[in-house]
Amino acid sequence: MEPCERPAPDFCAESEAYTLFRRGVDFLDEGHPAQAAMYLSRALRLEPGRNSIRETLGRAEFAAGRFERAADLFREVVADVPDCDYAHYALARSLKALGRGEEARGHLRLARALHPGCETYRQPLDGVD
């Protein structure tokens, strides 16, 4: 599950949190979401207010099949940044995986409204659309 547009990390490249974040992203990109989640969780403990870490950790948790944890993380991003289209989309996917299609529907609609040009968001989600 990739965002349509990847935002740049919002913290200092020299920090320990950034190093952990980059390692987590590398593990995620290499198809190792559980290892990615370990690094990203450590980064989030160091920088608890960073939505870029929270969103990437949500992606890792989703890829690892930990949908409840992923939904919690994406819900936190949505609460902090209500116009984050990707967080709404990822929350919809997580809720769908948990069998909560009705709850997912609103977040999918919001993602589509916030970023109507994203082909990924326009693809139907079974049981949600």
Model segments located where?
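Long, contiguous interaction/recruitment modules in multidomain scaffold/adaptor proteins
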Residues: 1-15
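Structural signature of tandem alpha-helical TPR/SEL1-like repeats
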Residues: 2, 30-41, 64-76, 98-110
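TPR/TPR-like (Sel1-like) alpha-helical repeat modules
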Residues: 93-120, 126
